[in-house]
């Protein structure tokens, strides 16, 4: 499995290259239709997730530990966590979701993340789990209130 890290090249090979014949023949409407249909889910959301993972390094002073690795996690049953960071010395596990969608993120996303975090086997019997949620359109007041009550949740817009 390989991944092109340059977002412009990703865009080119995902949208331009497969549609060259339409573009060259002047059928821009077909290309634009495909772009509108797939641009957010098949390009922007992945770019946003990568930006969120990079942002974790900038948020290092938010948590009372320093993590060693930042990446993502998935298992054989297609469960996925957008952001995962570990602190091997202290047994801290940071998990996060990145939501690039219309509307605010609610408690349901946090609950789903909490369930997925329990599936992670890393240091399972001796760890502290921290949560971070990223959203381009904010959070519900219910989730903001819960985050204010708990020190293990960080919300970022």
Model-identified regions with their sequence ranges:
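Accessory nucleic acid-recognition modules appended to NTPase machines
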Residues: 1-80
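Conserved nucleotide-binding/hydrolysis micro-motifs of P-loop NTPases
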Residues: 9, 100-103, 137-140
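Extended hydrophobic-aromatic, low-complexity segments
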Residues: 21-23, 64-65, 80-82, 91-95, ...
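Conserved catalytic cores of phosphodiester-cleaving nucleases, focusing on short active-site segments
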Residues: 56, 81-85, 89-102, 113-115, ...
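Acidic/glycine-enriched edge-of-secondary-structure segments
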Residues: 70-75, 96-108
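Active-site-adjacent loop/helix micro-motif of nuclease/hydrolase catalytic cores
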Residues: 102-114, 141-143
